Curated annotation (Swiss-Prot):
This is Photosystem II CP47 reaction center protein. It is found in: Plastid, Chloroplast thylakoid membrane. It comes from the Eukaryota. HAMAP family: PSII_PsbB_CP47. PSII is composed of 1 copy each of membrane proteins PsbA, PsbB, PsbC, PsbD, PsbE, PsbF, PsbH, PsbI, PsbJ, PsbK, PsbL, PsbM, PsbT, PsbX, PsbY, PsbZ, Psb30/Ycf12, at least 3 peripheral proteins of the oxygen-evolving complex and a large number of cofactors. It forms dimeric complexes. One of the components of the core complex of photosystem II (PSII). It binds chlorophyll and helps catalyze the primary light-induced photochemical processes of PSII. PSII is a light-driven water:plastoquinone oxidoreductase, using light energy to abstract electrons from H(2)O, generating O(2) and a proton gradient subsequently used for ATP formation. It comes from Cycas taitungensis (Prince sago). Keywords: Chlorophyll, Chloroplast, Chromophore, Membrane, Photosynthesis, Photosystem II, Plastid, Thylakoid, Transmembrane, Transmembrane helix. The keyword Thylakoid applies.
Length: 508
C-alpha cells in the first residue's frame, strides 16, 4: 500500500479483528511497562529512612501510585512506613508488579491470536456479510463495564469492604497510612482534600455509568443523530475517546499540582504553593507557640517539632524548583538529607530577634536580608561593603540553634552567621550528603512535577488530536471528495485521499 508513517493506522480502519488485536497489544505494552518499572524502582529504592529519604526524594514514580491504592509491604521484608514485615502476601509491591507482567504476557498472546484469526463471525454483519461493528452497542457495553469497575472500586476497595482502603493522611502529611474510607455524601465530598469524596464520587459515577450503559444498550440512536455525529465511523470513536483521555489528563494534572486527597504529600512530596504560602512554616510556628504557652523552653518547644514536618519546610522539596532538563531524583540534586540541624534564631547585638527573608520559588539567587518582626530591614549581606550600613559585622548578628542536631549551639563569627543566614533563606536547615550519589547541588523536581508536566503536555497534544480526528470524521465526505450516501463500495481501507482516482469503486 505504500503508506507514510503517519497513516499506518489505516490498516485497521475496516478490520475489526485486527483493530481489537492492536488495542490488546497496547494494553500489553502499558501493563508490561508498569510491572517492569515497578520492579526497577524496587531494585533501586532504599526504604531505610521514610522521613528524610522518602520515595518522592528518591524519584520513585510508580511506587507512590501503588502505595496510594493500598500496597505498603514488600517481599524484601520492609514496609513503606518503616516497620519490618514477616508475611507480605501476594498483594505486595513485587506481587502487583509480577501480576502486571503476567497480564502483559497474556495480552501479548491474545493480541497475536486476534491478529492471526482476524476474520471472526462475530465481526460480520449478517445482512451484508461484510465486517462491521455496532459502535453504539459497543459504547453501551464499555460504559456499563467501566461503570461496574468504577462502582466496585468506590464501594468495595476504597471503603475497605473488600480491599485495604487507600492512603489517608492529616493536612500536614505526618500520620499517613492505608485505611478504609467512608463515603462523604454531603457538601464536604466536593472538597478535593477530603478522602471520603473519592469513595462517594466513584460510587455515584459508577451508578451513572451503569445506568448510561444500560440506556445505550437498550435504546438505538435516532437516524439523524447517527448520521449527524457519524456514529458508524470508527474515527468518531477515536475522536471521542481522545476527548475523554485529554479531559481526564487535564483534571489529574490539576489535582496533582495544586494538591488533593488523591496526591498525598507523603507519597508525591509537597506542592509549590505550600512553600509560597508558608504552609508548613505556619504550622511549625503554631506548635512552637503552643509549647511556649505550656511553659516549655524555646529549646524544648523546637525539639518537639517532628523532623518530617521540618523537612517539608525546605525549598529543596518544592517541585517548582526543578529545571526543565534537570533529569534525575531530588537526591541527585541537593543530596540525601541526613539530619535536621535545628532552627536558627538570629539576633542583633541588642538581643532583638531577626528573621531571614525566604527565597521565592522562581529565584535561583536572592539577597540575604534579615528583618525585624515588623518587616523592617535590620541586617543583610551587602553586595558592596564600602556602602554597607546593615552588614552582619556592623549590626553584630549572632545565631543560636534550637532543636535538631545543633540544639543549644550559638555562633558569633560573622562568616558562620552569614553561612547559616544564606541557608535559612531555603527554609529549615538540613545536613545533606552529596557524596554518595555525586549530587551536583542543583535542585530537581519531584514526581509531582514530572506527573503534572507530562499529563498537561499530553493533554494539550490530545486536545489537538481530538479536534483533528473529530474534523476528519465530521467532514469525511468533504476531505475524501466522496458523497457519504454514495451507493458504491469504496475501499477506504486502502486509500482515503482527496479525489484519489485510484480508489476502487464497485457499484452495489
Amino acid at each position: 500500500m505504500g503508506l507514510p508513517w503517519y497513516r499506518v493506522h489505516t490498516v485497521v480502519l475496516n478490520d475489526p479483528g485486527r483493530l481489537l488485536s492492536v488495542h490488546i497489544m497496547h494494553t500489553a505494552l502499558v501493563s508490561g511497562w508498569a510491572g517492569s518499572m515497578a520492579l526497577y524502582e524496587l531494585a533501586v529504592f532504599d526504604p531505610s529512612d521514610p522521613v528524610l529519604d522518602p520515595m518522592w526524594r528518591q524519584g520513585m514514580f510508580v511506587i507512590p501510585f501503588m502505595t496510594r491504592l493500598g500496597i505498603n509491604n514488600s517481599w524484601g521484608g520492609w514496609s513503606i512506613t518503616g516497620e519490618t514485615v514477616t508475611n507480605p502476601g501476594l498483594w505486595s509491591y513485587e506481587g502487583v508488579a509480577g501480576a502486571h507482567i503476567v497480564f502483559s504476557g497474556l495480552c501479548f498472546l491474545a493480541a497475536i491470536w486476534h491478529w492471526v484469526y482476524w476474520d471472526l463471525d462475530i465481526f460480520c454483519d449478517e445482512r451484508t456479510g461484510k465486517p462491521s461493528l455496532d459502535l453504539p452497542k459497543i459504547f453501551g457495553i464499555h460504559l456499563f463495564l467501566s461503570g461496574v469497575a468504577c462502582f466496585g472500586s468506590g464501594a468495595f476497595h476504597v471503603t475497605g469492604l473488600y480491599g485495604p482502603g487507600i492512603w489517608v493522611s492529616d493536612p500536614y502529611g505526618l500520620t499517613g497510612k492505608i485505611q478504609p474510607v467512608n463515603p462523604a455524601w454531603g457538601a464536604e465530598g466536593f472538597d478535593p482534600f477530603v478522602p471520603g469524596g473519592i469513595a462517594s464520587h466513584h460510587i455515584a459515577a459508577g451508578i451513572l455509568g451503569i445506568l448510561a450503559g444500560l440506556f445505550h444498550l437498550s435504546v438505538r440512536p435516532p437516524q439523524r443523530l447517527y448520521k449527524g455525529l457519524r456514529m458508524g465511523n470508527i474515527e468518531t470513536v477515536l475522536s471521542s475517546s481522545i476527548a475523554a483521555v485529554f479531559f481526564a489528563a487535564f483534571i489529574v494534572a490539576g489535582t496533582m499540582w495544586y494538591g488533593s486527597a488523591t496526591a498525598p504529600v507523603e507519597l508525591f512530596g509537597p506542592t509549590r504553593y505550600q512553600w509560597d504560602q508558608g504552609y508548613f512554616q505556619q504550622e511549625i510556628d503554631r506548635r512552637v507557640r503552643a509549647g511556649l504557652s505550656e511553659n516549655l523552653s524555646l529549646s524544648e518547644a523546637w525539639s518537639k517539632i517532628p523532623e518530617k514536618l521540618a523537612f517539608y519546610d525546605y525549598i529543596g522539596n518544592n517541585p517548582a524548583k526543578g529545571g526543565l532538563f534537570r533529569a534525575g531524583a531530588m537526591d541527585n540534586g541537593d543530596g540525601i538529607a541526613v539530619g535536621w540541624l535545628g532552627h536558627p534564631i538570629f539576633r542583633d547585638k541588642e538581643g532583638h530577634e531577626l528573621f531571614v527573608r525566604r527565597m521565592p520559588t522562581f529565584f535561583e539567587t536572592f539577597p540575604v536580608v534579615l528583618v525585624d518582626e515588623e518587616g523592617i530591614v535590620k541586617a543583610d549581606v551587602p553586595f558592596r561593603r564600602a556602602e554597607s550600613k546593615y552588614s552582619v559585622e556592623q549590626v553584630g548578628v549572632t545565631v543560636e540553634f534550637y532543636g535538631g542536631e545543633l540544639d543549644g549551639v550559638s555562633f558569633g563569627d560573622p562568616a558562620t552567621v552569614k553561612k547559616y543566614a544564606r541557608r535559612a533563606q531555603l527554609g529549615e536547615i538540613f545536613e545533606l550528603d552529596r557524596a554518595t550519589l555525586k549530587s551536583d547541588g542543583v535542585f530537581r523536581s519531584s514526581p509531582r512535577g514530572w506527573f503534572t508536566f507530562g499529563h498537561a503536555t499530553f493533554a494539550l497534544l490530545f486536545f489537538f488530536g481530538h479536534i483533528w480526528h473529530g474534523a476528519r470524521t465530521l467532514f469525511r465526505d468533504v476531505f475524501a471528495g466522496i458523497d457519504p450516501d454514495l451507493d458504491a463500495q469504496v475501499e477506504f481501507g486502502a486509500f482515503q485521499x482527496l479525489g484519489d482516482p485510484t480508489t476502487k469503486r464497485q457499484i452495489v
